[in-house]
Structures are given as structure tokens and as C-alpha cells.
Amino acid sequence: MSLSVFWFLPTHGDGQYLGTNEGARPVDHAYLQQIAQAADRLGFGGVLIPTGRSCEDAWLVAASLIPVTQRLRFLVALRPGVISPTQAARQAATLDRLSNGRALFNLVTGGDAEELAGDGVFLDHRERYAESAEFTRVWRRVLEGETVDYEGKHVHVRGARLLFKPVQQPRPPLWFGGSSEVAQDLAAEQVDVYLTWGEPPAQVKEKIERVQAKAAAQGRKVRFGIRLHVIVRETNEEAWQAADRLISHLDDETIAKAQEALARTDSVGQQRMAALHGGKRDRLEISPNLWAGVGLVRGGAGTALVGDGPTVAARMQEYADLGIETFILSGYPHLEEAYRVGELLFPHLDLVVPEIPRPAAILAQGEHIAHQFVPQKVSQS
């Protein structure tokens, strides 16, 4: 099976090591542009742009990089409870039009109650997913060209519609990751691509089978992707040395502080990530060539595939055999590691390289009348 491989834009910081400012580098627009253009040229299918208060705004970053890339797609976050579904639909359509169909959207419910409260969201885990389901129902229908009346517990709109259609039809794809039962129910009902963090293959297999069964019960099919870090070198020995070097500045106090902060989340996925290593340095290779060292101090995706090109490709194929079609990878620092992946890993993959999209036909229609109607040709009397 051909695989699509995405890269990652480190809008929350980057450097040579984890958990220290030693070897850190400034992440300004010029640096993000370097990474995006490298990914564009190397054949990555797109880039994931993270979201949250520790990151630059994903939508603005994506918009700023459209003119300097040709084929790269941008996976940006939708935040139910933080923005209305109709406004999000308008923004999504605009980003898709400006990028000539290169926009993808990632539904993010959040898991940190403290951060969510700062954004004005005070719902518990189950209610956040209920709100996300309502949000997504409206968002999808509006983008697909419907005029929507909807009254739910959390979302209420009347006459919601879109005047400027997206390039991708019927709408840009919706991605989503979540490990709880309610998250998987949402995925089965609403999303196009279900994402998992890089757990061992047996655990990923269980997730895929559950989501597939839930989707089939609703007459739907869902595609699957996985989010992993990667440390690829010319030899396996060099790759493991690089993994050790990445956490060589970490002390036990920093690890404990990070694990304490991550433990307050109600994210089931984050809890599963933490359980893989237990905050201990001595149990980091949790599956062949799957290393949990990143998760000692990083929230979210916390595991990396480690090895030479053929070894990492073989481990990726194990996930592909389970149904994974898209791999979202990253490595520290992100510019250099993008080139290493392109040079050492890509030759061993059956890689899907996106084509440069042809310009979409945007029809001339004049200014909308009273902000409501597309003007029509006036008949001659």
C-alpha cells in the first residue's frame, strides 16, 4: 500500500535537545518557512500545525506559508467551544480557496482543564465531546453547501450558510484523534481520517478495529493515520545514540515536573502515552524500535521510531498492514530531520507524493447584493 507522510511545524519551539534551552533555536517565520519549503520539495504530503496556548496560531501560520509552497497541504485545528462552527466553516472555505485546495482540518477538543478554562471552556470530558459532535455536524453541512437550522444542547444556529464554496468538494477532509469511547463514537459518525498517537502495534490494532466497527454500524468507512516522531540515521547504532543524545540534558526533576503537569489532563490518549514509560528512563523501548523517550517531557505524541532507513520503513509497514495510510512524523531539530527523513527513509517507502494542484476555476460573480445574494445577469427590457 502506498503511504502518505506528513511533517510537523514546531510553532511551540525547537532545538537539539529536549527539556532544556541548551541547543534551542528561535522559531520565527523565516525558520518555519525553511521547514515548510523543505517539506514541500522533499515530497511530504503535508504538515501538521499544532494548537494551544504554547503555540503560534495555526491558521495564521498556514495562511502565511501558502504563497511560499506549491504542493504542501496544511492540517490546522478546529476548536469547538472556542469558535462557532459557522465562522469556522467560513475560515475553512477561505483557507481552502487561498491555498487552491491544500487545506485539511483537525478537530481538537482539548484535554487540559486549566488551559480550556483560559479559553472560556468549562465543560467536562463527555460534554466537550457532545459539543464537538454538534459543532462538527453544523460545520460539515455548511461547508457542503446546505443552509442549516440546528438546535442542540451546545450549538444553536438558524439559516447558517456559506457564500464562498471551498475548492475541495464536497468539503475539505476532517481529521481527528481521540482514545476515549466518546471520542471514537464521534470519529465513527463524523470524521474522514482517525488519528492515533504512536502506541505499539497491538494497541493500535485494537483502536482501529473498534473505530472500524463503530463506523460500519453507521454505514461509514474511516481512514487511519498515526502521529510519531522519528530518529533515522545511516545505521541503527547511530540512531539509538541520537535518541540518547536527545534526552541527555534531562534531569529527574524536569521529568517529574512534566509528568505532574501532564497528569492533570483528562485526555485518555495522554494517559495511555504516559503509561508506556511510567516516567522512567529505564523502560523506553516499549516495542521493537519504538522509543518513548520524547514523552518524558512532551505532551501529546511521545514516541519515536528509531533506526536506519530500512528498519524504520519496516516498522512503518507493520502499522500500514493494520490499516494506517498516513504517517505524521517529526524530529528534533525539525529542519535537519526533515532532510534526514527525505534522504534516508523515503527511498525505502512506497511514497505518495502530491502533485502541484492545478489552479481552481474561481468564477467572476461581482459583489454580493446586501451581503446575501450572488448577483445575476439583468434581463434587458
Swiss-Prot record:
GO terms for biological process: alkanesulfonate catabolic process. Pfam families: Bac_luciferase (PF00296). Keywords: Flavoprotein, FMN, Monooxygenase, Oxidoreductase. The keyword Flavoprotein applies. The keyword Flavoprotein applies. PANTHER family: ALKANESULFONATE MONOOXYGENASE, ALKANESULFONATE MONOOXYGENASE-RELATED. This is Alkanesulfonate monooxygenase. Transmembrane segments: none annotated. Its EC number is 1.14.14.5. It comes from Erwinia tasmaniensis (strain DSM 17950 / CFBP 7177 / CIP 109463 / NCPPB 4357 / Et1/99). The gene is ssuD. Gene3D superfamilies: Luciferase-like domain. FMNH(2) which is absolutely required for this enzymatic reaction, is provided by SsuE. NCBIfam families: alk_sulf_monoox (TIGR03565), PRK00719.1 (NF001939). It comes from the Bacteria. It is an enzyme of class 1 (oxidoreductase). Belongs to the SsuD family. One of its GO terms (molecular function) is alkanesulfonate monooxygenase activity. Catalyzes the desulfonation of aliphatic sulfonates. Coiled coil: none annotated. Homotetramer. It catalyses: an alkanesulfonate + FMNH2 + O2 = an aldehyde + FMN + sulfite + H2O + 2 H(+).
